[in-house]
């Protein structure tokens, strides 16, 4: 076999392959064997029909077609390996010449990973938010905890802000009661904003047994997005009573003996959260700076696939669970269809570029992934998906996604290596030492790498089709 490569553009090549006919022998033998098992010829046992009889009865062309279909993937793969290409997706194959007994010639056009040069990135500088926990932050945190321990007691008076009501609801659209628009015994706190727009105004001033009707746009269910006439009946009004902020409350709501200890712990927890946010912010901003330094051409077909994947996931998974369609979602977001298309395309481009650049860094820095690192990443992914580590690991193995997880960890390490060499300052002008936030930094880096892995999954699916 002889092959040559023609570069069509930075992300696409054309392979020209010439195969001497004798190299088709194994595929021809397999073709005759396959046809032998599929046909019956009088006078011959099944599977024992001579090749010349098959040629006479069914045509040499049918045999050649079967042999070529069997041989093409192998010769294509050999040509790719010989040229040391990194193909993306399925090739477009064209058989240019097939002469029985002489030669098989074909071309294959395919997208490839572009060649990327990573420049010196040690001079990257970014600014992040300072980690500052104010007294107001601590007060708000403790107050939220206090709210969780509030008690309620029924009262015989008109409902007011902060009261907890027990409600019966009924929604009509075009005069018809919705099957999923009836709910009894619903608990609702006035001012929480957890139910329908307009409900606070409708129930304020009502006592137990009171009833009101108002119009509101439904947020979910079979008539999501439609205007409905909602009838609400108050069956109980209860006042909320907050516990006193003292040592007794600290003992009730935590493992601490004093309110001072509880407040100190809240301050520490808030600082840890802000440090994680700071590490995430540093990762994202360093990544943006890195992408600005590197010229990364993006294959158009890969980009189209990534855009379609993102749209599909949004419409059929996220919005589907919320009972929304894309049109209603854009309305709630205050975006036009054109703005959505632009944002989706930009996010897809960034995801693909991120994957290409970080993968190149993994090779350049010779980064490896240990079993311990992979296990830790798997456990984080399991927690974020709401699955047990064992369930998640089993699903990953069954779906053949272990290499994807390895890639996510490796890319996370590559990005962490770039951040380590970058200068990170907070808004106060102070140098941020991310070594003190190693765990947060690693998790943030792997989150970015996981986002970038969407494109790789699309690549792998396409490559599976090619190999098949």
From Swiss-Prot:
GO terms for biological process: 'de novo' cotranslational protein folding; cell division; chaperone-mediated protein folding; protein transport; protein unfolding. Residues 454-468 have a biased composition (Basic and acidic residues). The keyword Cell division applies. It is an enzyme of class 5 (isomerase). Its EC number is 5.2.1.8. Keywords: Cell cycle, Cell division, Chaperone, Cytoplasm, Isomerase, Rotamase. Residues 432-453 have a biased composition (Acidic residues). Involved in protein export. Acts as a chaperone by maintaining the newly synthesized protein in an open conformation. Functions as a peptidyl-prolyl cis-trans isomerase. Consists of 3 domains; the N-terminus binds the ribosome, the middle domain has PPIase activity, while the C-terminus has intrinsic chaperone activity on its own. Belongs to the FKBP-type PPIase family. Tig subfamily. This is Trigger factor.
